[in-house]
């Protein structure tokens, strides 16, 4: 495995957002290359525990080099965190969950993973190459209308129908298997070019999100967090594009408001208690400073949102 450099975005801020207790139990739902996990471990005492999760086999290989009895790694999607926690009898005892969403720099920089239009490689895009359909397989079998919907929904691509038609026509002639081929087809089908962005940017994002069910993963993990967090436990979540951040922002806002009851609706105290109260308290958001963006341009679009589990 090549050693691709990865600079962890908002490292200190995300871990500080967890408000680490030395004897606490924490989850790093996106281990990656271990930047957040190592910092969390450095702040834990002997009684502390860190459960890390990743579905990328390369990340698992890195995690297995950490020889620390307080640390354990799980190969799987973070959407199943409630199951992992229940297996260890930690339900309701988790003091913090950190998620660093999206694709990592090592994944983007490794041409063999097929995430980037900047490097020619197999058209794969799977976070876990051992499971599910690759991007090439999906694009070769999907209907034109479905491809267009994915590009529009997950890439916010205004030329989605044109690009989908071009992809289907190209695959009919000769199936695409390389990232360079897809990038060229998209560029040729895009009538108006953005001088600041490669024409394939939105298509690659959309296909990657679809192949990995990324938004569903986020929604399920957020929902599960409410059942596993202890009162006062923290959520610290880094997003990299508007679709991710929209889901996180909406979830934290809704759970911070509690049940919405029409004004003037007659209710007994027992009925109000049955509805429950606020599940979370939103603690705000942070964005990278100029220095971090200058040192790591990929940090530019990142947003960190932090929330705390209430006693509800």
Curated annotation (Swiss-Prot):
Q: Which organism is it from?
A: Salmonella choleraesuis (strain SC-B67)
The name under which this protein is listed is Ribosomal RNA small subunit methyltransferase H
Say which enzyme class the record assigns: transferase
NCBIfam families the UniProt entry points to: 16S rRNA (cytosine(1402)-N(4))-methyltransferase RsmH
GO biological process terms, semicolon-separated:
rRNA base methylation
The record, for HAMAP family, names: 16SrRNA_methyltr_H (MF_01007)
| EC number, UniProt record | 2.1.1.199
Any GO CC annotation of this UniProt entry: cytoplasm
The UniProt keyword set, sorted, is: Cytoplasm, Methyltransferase, rRNA processing, S-adenosyl-L-methionine, Transferase
Chemical reaction(s) catalysed: cytidine(1402) in 16S rRNA + S-adenosyl-L-methionine = N(4)-methylcytidine(1402) in 16S rRNA + S-adenosyl-L-homocysteine + H(+)
* Cell location: Cytoplasm
Which Cys pairs does UniProt list as disulfide-bonded?
Answer: none
Looking up Gene3D superfamilies in the UniProt record yields: Putative methyltransferase TM0872, insert domain (1.10.150.170), Vaccinia Virus protein VP39 (3.40.50.150)
Which PANTHER family does the record associate with it? 12S RRNA N4-METHYLCYTIDINE METHYLTRANSFERASE, S-ADENOSYL-METHYLTRANSFERASE MRAW
What family does the database annotate?
Belongs to the methyltransferase superfamily. RsmH family.
InterPro entries from the xrefs?
A: RsmH, SAM-dep_MeTrfase_MraW_recog, SAM-dependent_MTases_sf
Q: Where does S-adenosyl-L-methionine bind?
A: 34-36, 54, 78, 100, 107
Stated role = Specifically methylates the N4 position of cytidine in position 1402 (C1402) of 16S rRNA.
GTP-binding listed as a keyword: no
User: Which lineage do the record's taxonomy fields give for this organism?
Assistant: Bacteria, Pseudomonadati, Pseudomonadota, Gammaproteobacteria, Enterobacterales
Specify the domain of life of the species encoding this protein: Bacteria
Q: Which gene encodes it?
A: rsmH
Name the Gene Ontology molecular function terms of this record. rRNA (cytosine-N4-)-methyltransferase activity
């Amino acid at each position: 495995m090549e050693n691709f450099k990865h600079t962890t975005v908002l490292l200190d801020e995300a871990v500080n957002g967890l408000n680490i207790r030395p004897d606490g139990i924490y989850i790093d739902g996106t281990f990656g290359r271990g930047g957040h996990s190592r910092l969390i471990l450095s702040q834990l005492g002997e009684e502390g525990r860190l459960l890390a999760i990743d579905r990328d086999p390369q990340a698992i290989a890195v995690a297995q080099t950490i020889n620390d009895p307080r640390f354990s790694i799980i190969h799987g999607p973070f959407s199943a965190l409630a199951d992992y926690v229940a297996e260890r009898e930690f339900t309701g005892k988790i003091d913090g969950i950190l998620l660093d969403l999206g694709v990592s720099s090592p994944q983007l920089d490794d041409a063999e993973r097929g995430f980037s239009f900047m490097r020619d490689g197999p058209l794969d895009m799977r976070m876990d190459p051992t499971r599910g359909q690759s991007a090439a397989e999906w694009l070769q079998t999907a209907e034109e209308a479905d491809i267009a919907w994915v590009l529009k929904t997950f890439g916010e691509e205004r030329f989605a129908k044109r690009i989908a038609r071009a992809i289907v026509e190209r695959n009919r002639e000769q199936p695409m298997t390389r990232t360079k081929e897809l990038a060229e087809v998209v560029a040729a089908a895009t009538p108006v070019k953005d001088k600041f962005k490669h024409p394939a940017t939105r298509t690659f994002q959309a296909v990657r999100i679809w192949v990995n069910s990324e938004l569903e993963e986020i929604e399920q993990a957020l929902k599960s967090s409410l059942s596993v967090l202890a009162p006062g436990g923290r959520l610290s979540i880094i997003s990299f594009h508007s679709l991710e951040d929209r889901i996180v922002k909406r979830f934290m806002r809704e759970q911070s408001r509690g049940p919405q009851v029409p004004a003037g609706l007659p209710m007994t105290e027992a009925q109000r208690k049955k509805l429950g109260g606020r599940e979370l308290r939103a603690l705000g958001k942070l964005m990278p400073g100029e220095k971090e963006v200058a040192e790591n341009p990929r940090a530019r679009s990142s947003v960190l949102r932090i929330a705390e589990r209430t006693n509800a």
